[in-house]
């Protein structure tokens, strides 16, 4: 039995124990984790500094460096997120529906843990804590495989989690991490279907492709966010600029940040110079289509010609594609061709246009007069999220607690036999 099989077997055994825990016991463990994250913050931050130094030396982009960075404020927020998970309702054991059949059998459909979840992710140290806390709350064990960029940070945070579990009399194997950077171990994890019940990759398109093609475990993909906002012909310009500013500026490296702005041709001449002035204030580079370039070339913001490939990639930086479309249908067509089914928005004062856009755009989150930055487990009231699913089965959008459960049928009888 190799390393991964040992980890898988230990995780499966831990999952059976976790599935039997009361909500109070799970919350106790989460509270201890949150407290230890704070008391051991210097150890974790020092580990993160080692990862940051190595990442800078390797030439990592500023966008990815921002994702990798832990600050005292970010770590405190992560600890508070764990406490927020404590306060969330536990879905395990909840009766979804039920009925009394003509046969006399009382039938219930009840939420239960999935079992063991595997998560593969890149330069996102917060994922370690977010995923572990959600899995523990739902009675699932988890095997984590972070990128080599987060090696020391993940090592420190998993150590804290395992210490907390042991303090609460729970198996440390409930949260395990694959520490070796050997990529072969990822391939082995993808085939660990004897022990792992669901796999969640959080990374780029190449990782998602690898998991879809090689995994023998059910995979939930998502997190790649080529997010769009369409400025309709009757949008309120000043309010629209505020929404665009939030969607692009607040955290450019986030997967729910705005990447492509589509502007109705009827308002492009007036709106685009205003956009240029607003984006200039934040150092945003505009990547303009041939149609948009004449209205942006003399503006305040830096502008370059958009490349065809730009429409299909995440910038994750202070860059924004800008194109002009003839009408709402052209905007929808653009989103269908280039979007990733993550988060897309329309800015409009027309109720009929808003409803049409919502029905036509097939993304996991669609917004009317709101920023794409809202696609987040915390913002949706779900607590921390394990991922943002852009597929339709078994979960869609920010994956909170319910998405980490399945259900079983339970029948109660009085020595019933089938006639």
Swiss-Prot record:
Q: Any idea where this protein resides?
A: Cytoplasm
One GO molecular-function annotation for this sequence? glutamate-5-semialdehyde dehydrogenase activity
A GO BP term here is: L-proline biosynthetic process
Q: List the disulfide bonds.
A: none
Keyword annotations for this protein, in alphabetical order, are: Amino-acid biosynthesis, Cytoplasm, NADP, Oxidoreductase, Proline biosynthesis
A GO cellular-component term linked to this record: cytoplasm
Catalytic reaction list: L-glutamate 5-semialdehyde + phosphate + NADP(+) = L-glutamyl 5-phosphate + NADPH + H(+)
State the similarity comment.
Belongs to the gamma-glutamyl phosphate reductase family.
NCBIfam families, alphabetized: PRK00197.1, proA
Name the record gives this protein: Gamma-glutamyl phosphate reductase
Species this chain originates from: Yersinia pestis
């Amino acid at each position: 039995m190799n390393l991964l099989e040992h980890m898988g077997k230990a995780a499966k055994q831990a999952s059976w124990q976790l599935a039997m825990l009361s909500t109070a016991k799970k919350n106790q463990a989460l509270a201890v984790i949150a407290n230890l994250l704070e008391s051991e913050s210097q150890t974790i931050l020092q580990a993160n500094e080692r990862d940051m130094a190595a990442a800078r030396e390797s030439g990592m982009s500023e966008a990815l460096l921002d994702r990798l960075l832990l600050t005292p404020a970010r770590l405190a927020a992560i600890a508070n997120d764990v406490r927020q998970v404590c306060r969330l309702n536990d879905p395990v054991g909840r009766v979804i529906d039920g009925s009394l059949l003509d046969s006399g059998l009382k039938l219930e459909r009840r939420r239960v843990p999935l079992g063991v979840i595997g998560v593969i992710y890149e330069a996102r140290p917060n994922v370690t804590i977010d995923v572990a806390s959600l899995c523990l709350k739902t009675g699932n064990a988890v095997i984590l495989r972070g990128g080599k960029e987060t090696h020391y940070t993940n090592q420190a945070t998993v150590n804290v989690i395992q210490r907390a579990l042991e303090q609460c009399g729970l198996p440390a194997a409930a949260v395990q991490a694959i520490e070796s950077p050997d990529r072969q171990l990822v391939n082995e994890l993808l085939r660990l279907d004897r022990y792992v019940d669901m796999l969640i990759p959080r990374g780029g398109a190449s990782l998602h492709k690898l998991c879809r093609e090689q995994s023998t475990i059910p995979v939930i993909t998502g997190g790649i966010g080529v997010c769009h906002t369409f400025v309709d012909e009757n949008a309120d310009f000043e309010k629209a600029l505020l929404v665009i500013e939030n969607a692009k500026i607040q955290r450019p490296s986030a997967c729910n940040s705005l990447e492509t702005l589509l502007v109705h041709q009827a308002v492009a001449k007036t709106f685009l110079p205003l956009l240029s002035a607003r984006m200039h204030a934040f150092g945003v580079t505009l990547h303009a289509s041939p149609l948009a370039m004449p209205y942006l070339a003399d503006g305040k913001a830096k502008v370059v010609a958009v490349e065809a490939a730009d429409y299909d990639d995440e910038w994750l930086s202070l860059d924004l594609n800008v194109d002009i479309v003839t009408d709402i249908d052209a905007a929808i067509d653009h989103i269908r061709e280039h979007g990733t089914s993550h988060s897309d928005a329309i800015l409009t004062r027309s109720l009929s246009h808003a409803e049409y856009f919502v029905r036509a755009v097939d993304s996991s989150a669609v917004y009317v007069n709101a920023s794409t930055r809202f696609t987040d487990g915390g913002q949706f009231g779900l607590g921390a999220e394990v991922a943002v699913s852009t597929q339709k089965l078994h979960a869609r959008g920010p994956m909170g607690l319910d998405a980490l459960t399945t259900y079983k049928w339970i029948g109660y009888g009085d020595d019933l036999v089938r006639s």
